[in-house]
């Protein structure tokens, strides 16, 4: 059984609200950079950056973060140091206010890995987390600073975020396992 809990309009409103909250919390967009976690976090990050451009008339740098080498749930060769494979980060995070964007916050492990990757890129002034969906069930003490929608769910359920750039539609669904 599949239940749509966020449609395209609700997703658009949530991202717009997150954008306003980012501006308010940071008192503007000075020294702000946005990093989207691959895959869907990248597209959400670009949408937030686009809204920031519209609202503040400033282009905020956006990058794509691949955290695969930093994940603790994948078997890695213990002899090799993780290497940031940030395919699309052409700016420094040193001293910047980083907005880390992902589609779903669940256990917190993806975010922990992303923070490790960011620290390998440099020492940011701060890191704030923006997620479209917070579903609970944390295994690590991580919380989002900006949340589009809280969707309590059981661990047997799956939250699926679809974005039009790769899925041909915008939606958030709960799927029964």
Swiss-Prot record:
Entry superkingdom: Bacteria
Family matches, as InterPro entries: PRibTrfase_dom, PRTase-like, PyrR, PyrR_bifunctional
EC number, as in UniProt: 2.4.2.9
This protein's UniProt keywords: Glycosyltransferase, RNA-binding, Transcription, Transcription regulation, Transcription termination, Transferase
A single MF term (Gene Ontology): RNA binding
A GO BP annotation: DNA-templated transcription termination
Catalytic function, reaction form: UMP + diphosphate = 5-phospho-alpha-D-ribose 1-diphosphate + uracil
Subunit structure: Homodimer and homohexamer; in equilibrium.
HAMAP family given in the database record: PyrR
Function statement: Regulates transcriptional attenuation of the pyrimidine nucleotide (pyr) operon by binding in a uridine-dependent manner to specific sites on pyr mRNA. This disrupts an antiterminator hairpin in the RNA and favors formation of a downstream transcription terminator, leading to a reduced expression of downstream genes. Also displays a weak uracil phosphoribosyltransferase activity which is not physiologically significant.
Family, as annotated: Belongs to the purine/pyrimidine phosphoribosyltransferase family. PyrR subfamily.
Annotated protein name in UniProt: Bifunctional protein PyrR
């Amino acid at each position: 059984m599949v239940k749509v809990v966020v449609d395209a309009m609700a997703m658009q409103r949530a991202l717009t609200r997150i954008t306003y909250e980012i501006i308010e919390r940071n008192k503007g967009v000075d020294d702000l950079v946005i990093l989207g976690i691959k895959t869907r976090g990248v597209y959400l990050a670009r949408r937030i950056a686009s809204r920031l451009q519209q609202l503040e008339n400033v282009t905020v740098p956006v990058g794509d973060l691949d955290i695969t080498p930093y994940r603790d749930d994948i078997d890695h060769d213990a002899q090799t140091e993780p290497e940031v494979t940030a395919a699309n980060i052409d700016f420094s995070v040193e001293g910047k206010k980083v907005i880390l964007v992902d589609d779903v916050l669940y256990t917190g492990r993806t975010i922990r890995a992303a923070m490790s990757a960011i620290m390998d890129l440099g020492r940011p002034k701060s890191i704030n987390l923006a997620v479209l969906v917070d579903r609970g069930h944390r295994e690590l003490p991580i919380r989002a600073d900006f949340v589009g929608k809280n969707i309590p769910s059981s661990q047997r359920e799956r939250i699926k975020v679809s974005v039009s750039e790769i899925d041909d539609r915008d939606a958030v669904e709960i799927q029964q396992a």
